[in-house]
Swiss-Prot record:
Subunit structure: Homodimer, may assemble into homohexamers. Homotetramer; forms a parallel homotetramer with a flexible rod-like structure that can give rise to I- and Y-shaped conformations. Interacts with GORASP1/GRASP65. The homooligomer forms a complex with GORASP1 with a 1:1 stoichiometry. Interacts with RAB1B that has been activated by GTP-binding. Interacts with p115/USO1; interaction with p115/USO1 inhibits interaction with STX5 and/or RAB1B. Interacts with STX5. Interacts with ZFPL1. Interacts with AKAP450/AKAP9; leading to recruit AKAP450/AKAP9 to the cis-Golgi.
Organism phylogeny: Eukaryota, Metazoa, Chordata, Craniata, Vertebrata
Primary localization: Golgi
Name of the featured protein: Golgin subfamily A member 2
Impact noted for substituting S37D: Phosphomimetic mutant that strongly reduces interaction with p115/USO1
Phosphoserine PTM positions: S37, S66, S273, S438, S697, S933, S977
Species in which this protein is naturally found: Rattus norvegicus (Rat)
Amino acid sequence: MWPPRFPPPRPGMSEETRQSKLAAAKKKLREYQQKNSPGVPAGAKKKKKIKNGHSPERTSASDCQSAENVPTDHTAPAPPSTAAATMFLGVVPSPDADLIQSHDAGNCSNLMEETKTFSSTESLRQLSQQLNGLVSESTSYINGEGLTSSNMKELESRYQELAVALDSSYVTNKQLSSTIEELKQQNQDTLDQLEKEKKDYQQKLAKEQGALREQLQVHIQTIGILVSEKAELQTALAHTQQAARQKAGESEDLASRLQSSRQRVGELERTLSTVSTQQKQADRYNKDLTKERDALKLELYKNGKSNEDLRQQNSELEEKLRVLVAEKAAAQLGAEELQKKLEMSELLLQQFSSQSEASGSNEQLQQAMEERAQLESHVGQLMESLKQLQVERDQYAENLKGESAMWQQRVQQMAEQVHALKEEKEQRESQVQELEASLAELRSQMEEPPPPEPPTGPSEAEERLQGEVEQLQKELEGLTGQLRAQVQDNESLSHLNREQEGRLLELEREAQHWSEQAEERKQILESMQSDRTTISRALSQNRELKEQLAELQNGFVRLTNENMEITSALQSEQHVKKELARKLGELQERLGELKETVELKSQEAQGLQEQRDQCLSHLQQYAAAYQQHLTAYEQLTSEKEALHKQLLLQTQLMDQLQHEEVQGKMAAEMARQELQEAQERLKASSQENQQLQAQLSLLVLPGEDMDQEEQDEEVPQPSLTIPEDLVSREAMVAFCNAAIARAEEEQARLRVQLREQKARCRSLAHLAAPVQSKLEKEAVVPRDMGDSVSEESNQALHVAMEKLQNRFLEVMQEKVELKERVEELEHCCIQLSGETDTIGEYIALYQNQRAVLKARHLEKEEYISRLAQDKEEMKVKLLELQELVLRLVNERNEWQGKFLAVSQNPADVPAPVPTGSQEFGAADQQGDLREVSLADDTEPAQGEAGVPAPQENPTAQQIMQLLREIQNPQERPGLGSNPCIPFFYRADENDEVKIMVI
């Protein structure tokens, strides 16, 4: 009977439940071994079968087979008797008994059925042998070997009995065959159920096997190691028992040493806790010192500023002293002069008193009295100023005394702090020396040579003690590392103390310097007091000089202020002048270009004026010729009235033709018809009329075309209006650019118009040339020919000349207006370009300032983000440190519990035989997953017998590393490598940082 299965331990199972289950499994295994202890060969047989891979069920089946085959093997081949037949029949098992045995056997039902069938065939074989014996006897009887009747009767009775037995055996065989079939069906059903259960069980095993395979491998390795150690331990058991008696005293010594070492470890832990608390206090004290250092830095900064202010005040006071010394010298000179004047005035008074009849004595007396009153008032003012100076001197001396007392108190406080730090340093050094001495003692105790061991192997108690000693050595090494870290921290603290001592020395030097300055100031004040007597004598005579000095000082201050204002104004004006010079250079370039264009235009205008003068001279000639022709035309009034009316109608029709093309064509046809009729009527004047009409058509058509072009070209002058909704500079720049573009377009259009006007003037000149030549020819023609010229042609010429003259004047006036407009537009363009340049410069300055401010803002944001990141990192490190400390405390508590258990129960060491049972129990606790052969697995390496030592716990090293990182943040690549603005920050309740930049 195998021990019951135990489920594998859960990963979250506690240590106590695991130990209780292990104890229960060990008890059950011991009971099982006690039960199976008498049947040792059976156990060996089971071990062999386990090794060969067979199950115990097969052993039971083989036992059943051997038990049933025994009677068949021992039956004799002789013909049996009735008793033997009955015995044989009794040997055959009944089906009910077979069923009960199959149900009791469980897994060996198939083997039992095989034994049943085997026994029935054996019985049939025996019956056939008996029948063959009877047949052989009958044949012998037939051959002559006669028998008696009694034998025959016996044989017959025997035969009858055998027949009855055959019938009964036949019936029993049928029953057995039916029962065998039923059992086969049941066996098949049970086999199917078993296969299903096996499949389910295999699936469960496959699921559980993956999780438990690693544990099984570990247990297999440990079992192999223990099996390999079992023989050695059994052989060494006697030796160890003898050695145990010898080493009982040694174990007691070791126990006493362990107790002393534990006490020492407890003391070391206490000292370490005290050192850690002292270190925390030192860290807090360092933080307080850093805060005080920052406050002292601020105070030093403020004191430096106050020093600078005081130095400036000292320099001002020295200058005032120099001025006062100069005033004193001048006052002494003035006093001497005034004494001389007084003597002279006294002499004059005596003279005036002696000469009472003198007329101007009263006036001189009044002047002397006025001068005396002025001197007295001046003396009063000087006394008041002296009192004010004394009050200021007293206040300054009191301030100096208060500052010197404050600095002395600060120096005393810093000296006391330095003294306290020195005492703490000495205490820590003494503690470190004591710890080092205790460590040296422990090392000497650990390094003492152990007593010679017997040839037999060490006991488990000694191994455990050695393991505990090694663990204690490791803990001592950890404590030594912590002590070294503490020593390093103490060295860093001593270094900080040295730095603070140096700073204190610097502060003391500054205080001495201040005291020396105070002494110098006292000397200056004493000298001022000594000079006070002399100044008080000269105060009565220094009023006028002081007033002059005050006036001069006021004038000097005014001049300095004016000079500063003038210099600032000059700088601004120089900047403006530079900009204006640059703009003037650009404007001069533009003006040069415009001057060139204006010169070209002026040359063109001069050419046009010359053409105008020529045209006017021609027109005057035309007017003279016209007056000559008028005298000739007066005679032809009666005959030419109708023609004149027709010409007027014709001119009107020509005007309509110019404005309306279609009507003009019809009117032209009508005029041509009327002209043809008139030509028929006036054959004499037809040639002259045709010439005049041709000239009029040449003169009138371009003039009217020009009128139309003028009407078409009369465009309203664009007025430059600045909108009121311009707020931003960008909109102003866009508006200026648009206005400049419009002005350039208008300038181009005006240039095109000028070119067209020039072309028109040229065409008019070309038109006027033939008219002028004709007039000159007509002037040369005699009066007789002039009589032939019609009056209507002269009138038409006169009208054409008037139109031409008016058109020329209008063209010139338009040209002048266009020039003025061009100049205005150029002026507007210059102004707009200047404004755009200034706006562009302002925009560039604004962008530069904005970029600088943005860069500073980005730097501040980066610095704040770095500080926040450092703060988060410190929080994470503190959390890690807390977790590591808790872990270290838990581990130490566990080790202390183990040590206490070992020290309280040093003799409760288990024997080597129960260790094997323990391992078997642990193996059985994991579950009967597969059968392991334990008989032949006795060949593992001897080096694997020892249990591997536990790994070092790195929590203490991590704690020390985190403490170093927290104490020395400069080791991390942070803000120390980058230059930054010094400022102090403090997080409030909402974790918001308020920054005070210095």
